[in-house]
């Protein structure tokens, strides 16, 4: 159960997706600009959420922003024949959220991170991209499970 202004984890992921997606068009150069992007998001202001970055959505946004190079490296390992700059912005943002959760959130099982990315792809992405997203995330999850990829907590 969530209280007014405190989104569920799925809603927090959706909020993080929207802000991170927007940052793809106008990147933040500092944490201050990242906080401003959060506070000015219509999904924060229009839904009565605190403009102060907090909670799970903010953790995802700040963590992905901070660790983007590492996250993109992992995505690159498993996106056979696809360079990061060739992956669609929606798909890349969804992949970044899920890979971040797999690597940096021990409380989120990889299967949950994959399922949540696929659910968000139904809301924001193209149906044809789900197999692509699932393939990359499944390969990353198997590498984590097999010890070839290490959590970075």
Swiss-Prot record:
Record GO terms (molecular function): RNA binding
GO terms for cellular component: cytosol
Record GO biological process: DNA-templated transcription termination; transcription antitermination
InterPro entries on file: NusB-like_sf (IPR035926), NusB_fam (IPR011605), NusB_RsmB_TIM44 (IPR006027)
Keywords: RNA-binding, Transcription, Transcription antitermination, Transcription regulation
Top-level taxon of the source organism: Bacteria
Function: Involved in transcription antitermination. Required for transcription of ribosomal RNA (rRNA) genes. Binds specifically to the boxA antiterminator sequence of the ribosomal RNA (rrn) operons.
HAMAP family for this protein: NusB (MF_00073)
NCBIfam families: nusB
Similarity-based family: Belongs to the NusB family.
Protein name: Transcription antitermination protein NusB
Originating organism: Nitratidesulfovibrio vulgaris (strain ATCC 29579 / DSM 644 / CCUG 34227 / NCIMB 8303 / VKM B-1760 / Hildenborough)
